[in-house]
């Protein structure tokens, strides 16, 4: 199954924007059942740093590693999740990026608003926010 998310980085998020993205994502991780790690075959912890958010699913529940950079302006990136359980964490990060660093990334997906809505609803409930989906979804 080729279910993929795409992002085209147009600008570098400020340190404050990136900090907010990291903090919201960490909050989500504390309040959801985690199914992510460094790589599908590497049980090391996922990576959340001042420049990257990087993770994959666990074992057979992983597919391609999600790696979002704060500093790769001009790069077109993608992550094929095959709609495996860690996909919701990819969607969480991309929704956060869209709302907290709105002019920095153009986000698209093989999925549509119906595919993303349950993850948006969960994110908004946990973070007590009213974030929106990217217009390109």
For each feature predicted by the language model, list its residue ranges.
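Acidic (Asp/Glu-rich) sequence patches and key acidic residues
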Residues: 1-137
């Amino acid at each position: 199954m080729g279910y993929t998310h795409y992002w085209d980085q147009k600008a570098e998020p400020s340190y404050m924007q990136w900090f907010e993205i990291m903090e919201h994502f960490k909050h989500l991780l504390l309040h959801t059942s985690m199914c992510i790690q460094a790589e599908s075959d590497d049980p090391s912890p996922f990576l959340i740093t001042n420049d990257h958010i990087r993770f994959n699913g666990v074992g057979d529940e992983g597919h391609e590693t999600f790696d979002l950079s704060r500093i790769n302006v001009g790069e077109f990136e993608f992550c094929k999740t095959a709609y495996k359980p860690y996909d919701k964490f990819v969607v969480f990060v991309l929704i956060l990026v869209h709302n907290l660093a709105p002019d920095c990334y153009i986000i698209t997906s093989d999925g549509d608003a119906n595919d993303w809505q349950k993850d948006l609803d969960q994110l908004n409930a946990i973070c007590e926010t009213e974030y929106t989906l990217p217009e390109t979804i």
